[in-house]
Amino acid sequence: MTALDEAIAQLAQSDAALRASIAPLSPTQWTWKPDAATWSSAEIAEHLVLVERGILFRLRTAPADGLEKTEGKEQVLGQLTQRTVKFPAPARLVPTGKYPAPADFEIDMSTARAATTAWAQNPDTDLHKHVMPHPVFGELHGLQWLLMIAQHTLRHIAQIREAIAHPEYPAG
């Protein structure tokens, strides 16, 4: 399996896990949050779409100026799924309440993930040459960004599971 195949598999697995996490949620559960500072499942879902669309837009327009700045970052990216460290979202990636129901989100997420996968699998795309900065991890190339998208999704699935495990989480 190539590195691209592995990244595409991680994207597919994280997408399936996300859908499985939100599928059973009632409208009340979809919008519930334990406190004002914590995102609801709906807000997490919106954030994931905003991030993925933003990354793809930036990658498509990133200069193809090399791999050397990004060596060894795959190991660092593995830390992204750990919820012990918080990464505050920039204002442009903070949810605004766009998705009143999971079905609304699923359409946009499917479109975003399909666009990401299609771009990555395009034979004219050299993933290693499209480099752009991450606010925490520094310069990453396109393949590393694909891994980051998958791991970012897994990180937020863990956040949804934390909400579901909360003692005040609504029954339905």
Language-model regions: role of each:
Residues 1-12, 16-38:
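An N-terminal domain-cap segment
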Residues 1-4, 98, 135-142:
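A short, mixed-charge helix-start or loop-turn motif at secondary-structure junctions
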Residues 1, 13-14, 27-31, 85-90, ...:
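Short hydrophobic/aromatic-rich motifs at helix boundaries and adjacent loops
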Residues 4-10, 18, 43, 50, ...:
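Soluble, non-transmembrane catalytic domains of enzymes that act on hydrophobic metabolites at membranes
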Residues 10, 76-129:
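Acidic/histidine-rich alpha-helical segments that form the ligand environment
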Residues 31-81, 121-172:
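Short, contiguous alpha-helical
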Residues 13, 17, 24, 111, ...:
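Residues on one face of amphipathic alpha-helical coiled coils
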